[in-house]
Amino acid sequence: MTAVIHPDIRPRINSVASDDLNAAERERIRAKSALFAPPEARLADGRRDLVGLSREELAALMTEIGEKPFRAKQLWHWIYHQGATDFSAMTTIAKPMQAKLAEHFVVSRPTTATEQTSVDETRKFLFRFRDGQEAETVYIPDRREDRGAVCISSQVGCTLSCTFCHTGTQKLVRNLGPAEIVGQFMAARDSYGEWPSPSADMPRYLSTIVLMGMGEPLYNYENVAKAMRIIMDGEGIALSRRRITLSTSGVVPMMDRCGDELGINLAISLHAVTNELRDQIVPLNRKYPIEELIAACRRYPAASNSRRITFEYIMLRGVNDSEADARELVRLIRDLPAKVNLIPFNPWPGSDFQPSTRQQLTKFANIVMDAGFASPIRTPRGQDILAACGQLKTESERQRRSATPEA
């Protein structure tokens, strides 16, 4: 059944284009984000988790236990370059110091609750965190090039309620902390044995990060930014900012900050070319309409002809896939360094949408391509394990609901 989109009669919130309003809105987002803060990264016995701490925080902890700050540099190397989780494996640190570190600290990973591998070799991890909450991470291999992307979650659940997205049916529980965000990538590396970190001239199986998992990363910006700085540090995991892409549904006030401070690649979950439709399928549009979103894209400092903004567009049959939609999309992005990823809708239990026909996908792609924009049609990956775009939702929640007896 094709979903029916009803016109929205709610008034649109006024523009937040001015600097003062943007600053006020960023503060509002920060305050709201704090309500969903992750738990402190500390064990019940009081030991502190060292994963997710900045270099400065590591140095301060060393001072607290009576050690020289240079110990932080040693720990950084062992934690993020070597991937060590046991202090006794840190052979450049004397044994008495290893014991002292183990008394005060841990180097942890999220627990792998389940791990599934698709027929196309896509692998989905359900990671469980210290408080029992869970999020999904997906590794998408490109065997032709011996490389692959790690799709990382930034929140448990999501607050956006996009109507075509499975994650949107799971309410936001909380934000993930830096240790939990970095930990997803580190645990995936553990699974593939990719330690120590490969040098710049060596191939990496886990070669890129896409912040396209569960949650809206710009609604958890502080924790995401801290995690990405750790991952980009040249003496640790050392993943270039050019190999990291953040996907947002359009949290306009935070886009400038992300570009200025992180300079990572930007992807926009667009999915509609009119405010009337986008208000319905991406409700965040009611706060930050398309005009403001495109203006923020024009300002994004990391965008260039060599680092184009990616516009993600899930093709929904009879909803957003007409030739007129394609022409309007071209008009919207006409002065941007951009490419368009056309994504066939990936069905999930309970959804009313249907994927566009192959013929309509091709027509749409050709219109965009003829206007000078790359418009590949994405090949669905991991559909059989609900790991494809728009399908993520913690499997444990689904299992619990199906196993709960009726009263």
UniProtKB/Swiss-Prot annotation:
Q: Under which EC number(s) is this enzyme classified?
A: 2.1.1.192
Q: Report the record's Gene Ontology biological process terms.
A: rRNA base methylation; tRNA methylation
Disulfide partners:
151-389
Q: Which UniProt keywords apply?
A: 4Fe-4S, Cytoplasm, Disulfide bond, Iron, Iron-sulfur, Metal-binding, Methyltransferase, rRNA processing, S-adenosyl-L-methionine, Transferase, tRNA processing
Query: PROSITE patterns from the xrefs?
Result: RADICAL_SAM
List the GO terms this entry assigns under cellular component, sorted alphabetically. Answer: cytoplasm
Name the family: Belongs to the radical SAM superfamily. RlmN family.
Q: Which protein, by its recorded name, is this?
A: Dual-specificity RNA methyltransferase RlmN
**Organism, per UniProt?**
Gluconobacter oxydans (strain 621H)
What gene does the UniProt entry assign to this protein? rlmN
